Curated annotation (Swiss-Prot):
<keyword id="KW-0584">Phenylalanine biosynthesis</keyword>
<dbReference type="InterPro" id="IPR018528">
    <property type="entry name" value="Preph_deHydtase_CS"/>
</dbReference>
<dbReference type="InterPro" id="IPR002912">
    <property type="entry name" value="ACT_dom"/>
</dbReference>
<feature type="transit peptide" description="Chloroplast">
    <location>
        <begin position="1"/>
        <end position="34"/>
    </location>
</feature>
<keyword id="KW-0150">Chloroplast</keyword>
<keyword id="KW-0934">Plastid</keyword>
<keyword id="KW-0057">Aromatic amino acid biosynthesis</keyword>
<protein>
    <recommendedName>
        <fullName>Arogenate dehydratase 4, chloroplastic</fullName>
        <ecNumber>4.2.1.91</ecNumber>
    </recommendedName>
</protein>
<keyword id="KW-0456">Lyase</keyword>
<dbReference type="Pfam" id="PF00800">
    <property type="entry name" value="PDT"/>
</dbReference>
<comment type="function">
    <text>Converts the prephenate produced from the shikimate-chorismate pathway into phenylalanine.</text>
</comment>
<keyword id="KW-0809">Transit peptide</keyword>
<dbReference type="InterPro" id="IPR001086">
    <property type="entry name" value="Preph_deHydtase"/>
</dbReference>
<feature type="domain" description="Prephenate dehydratase">
    <location>
        <begin position="126"/>
        <end position="303"/>
    </location>
</feature>
<feature type="domain" description="ACT">
    <location>
        <begin position="319"/>
        <end position="410"/>
    </location>
</feature>
<dbReference type="GO" id="GO:0006952">
    <property type="term" value="P:defense response"/>
</dbReference>
<dbReference type="GO" id="GO:0009507">
    <property type="term" value="C:chloroplast"/>
</dbReference>
Length: 424
């Protein structure tokens, strides 16, 4: 990976006149930086084929019962500072988002060209999420880290890299929905990047139908939103807007922003109540999700793991690959290692093994066939501070060619209400 200080840094400020709407919700100040960085430079040359000693080191960190020794500022001395603080010859000269009529417009999401190294500074925890202000991911970031400085990113990969490059301190990203299933992209990114899972948070999805002030439902000829949101409100939309066309948009809150920015009086969006507040839209219908049990699970990611404990329920996430030529038959042995120790599994997900996608089986007399090879993601209810979890993983290691602990973290045990728009 190229050294951060060798990036071709370019700077830009956000033009407040680029939007034709003034929003009422004050958003924390943002900074925008452009860098000649390319995403492929973060690909690990050996893919997922890390050594066993690598995994053992990670496991030792997670199972340690001794608090980590804190860095005494040495790292901060080596990384360029921001907001007027300099390091050596590097001065980022960042400019905060300007205001219009005394009100701050919602910040533009970080893109892949906005990534530039920055250290921890100030008292607010900076949390990256995918989407624009008003997205459900922003609500998850606020629940996970109250009073944080939320940083919108236009892609999941950018959110990962924002943490790695010290632009953000944490990332909060979705991994599964109770109706839509797993978000495979983020499972792949968990393996590609070296961030650690330090927590989880579950958010009820509370959809609203939004439009410009004064627009009635019978005037709506088009409804836009994320494909999952449109699918989750299909029956309600059939009743509310039976003749309206439905068009996919990349993000729920971005759909609301698009209507507001372009003054579209014939278009409605499926998004959160917070998006209506941010983009000066009215709520035509509240709580239009077809299934009240619509919940999205988010993971909290950090550069360093947390010390696992036993005084509260913990969950541990791992990823592994079967030994070569063994195929998925070893999955039974792996699962037995947990069952024998009375460890409950909460999630099993398979993803293609990108380094070894196919396995040739058979002999010359009857020909050969090709089977797919997979990586397996498993969540189980135990802390890495517990001997049973350590012993289970020691046995699992015997059956696998690759094993990595993604994190051992507290389970989200907080109650939530499906009827509150504040949750969305």
């Amino acid at each position: 990976m190229q050294a951060a200080t060798s990036c071709d840094l370019k700077f830009r400020s956000t033009d407040p006149t680029s939007r034709n709407k003034c929003f009422s919700h004050a958003i924390p100040k943002r900074v925008a930086v452009t860098c000649g960085y390319r995403s492929e430079s973060f690909s690990f040359p050996n893919g997922v084929s890390v050594s066993r000693s690598d995994w053992q080191s990670s496991c030792a960190i997670l199972s340690s019962k001794v608090a980590s020794v804190e860095n005494t500022g040495g790292l901060a001395d080596k990384i360029a500072a921001v907001n007027g603080h300099t390091n050596g010859s590097v001065n980022l000269g960042l400019v905060a988002v300007e205001s219009t009529n005394g009100k701050l417009a919602p910040a533009q999401p970080l893109t892949i060209t906005d990534l530039s190294p920055a250290p921890l500074h100030g008292s607010s925890l900076r949390v990256a999420y995918q989407g624009v202000p008003g997205a459900y991911s922003e609500a998850a970031a606020g629940k996970a880290y109250p009073n944080c400085d939320a940083i919108p990113c236009d892609q999941f990969d950018v959110a990962f890299q924002a943490v790695e490059l010290w632009i953000a301190d944490r990332a909060v990203l979705p991994v599964e929905n109770s109706l839509g299933g797993s978000i495979h992209r983020n499972y792949d990114l968990l393996l590609r990047h070296r961030l650690h899972i330090v927590g989880e948070v579950q958010i009820p999805v509370h959809h609203c139908l939004l439009a410009l002030p004064g627009v009635r439902t019978d005037c709506v000829s088009r409804v836009i939103s994320h494909p999952q949101a449109l699918a989750q409100t299909e029956h309600s939309l059939d009743v509310l807007t039976p003749h309206a066309a439905r068009e996919a948009f990349h993000d729920t809150a971005a759909a609301a922003e698009y209507i507001s920015a372009n003054d579209l009086h014939d278009t409605a969006a499926v998004a959160s109540a917070r998006a209506a507040e941010l983009y000066n839209l009215q709520i035509l219908a509240d709580g239009i999700q077809d299934d009240p049990g619509n919940v999205t699970r988010f993971l909290m990611l950090a550069r360093e793991p947390i010390i696992p404990r036993t005084d509260r329920p913990f969950k541990t996430s791992i990823v592994f690959a079967a030994q070569e030529h063994k195929g998925t038959s070893v999955l039974f042995k792996v699962l037995s290692a947990f069952a024998f120790r009375d460890i409950s599994l909460t999630k099993i997900e398979s993803r293609p093994h990108h380094n070894r996608p196919l396995r040739v089986v058979g002999d010359g007399s009857f020909g050969t066939s090709k089977n797919f090879e997979y990586m397996f993601y498993v969540d189980f209810e135990a802390s890495m501070a517990e001997p049973r979890a350590q012993n289970a993983l020691a046995e699992v290691q015997e059956y696998t060619s690759f094993l990595r602990v993604l994190g051992s973290y507290p389970m989200d045990m907080t109650p939530w209400s499906m009827t509150s728009t504040e949750e969305a």
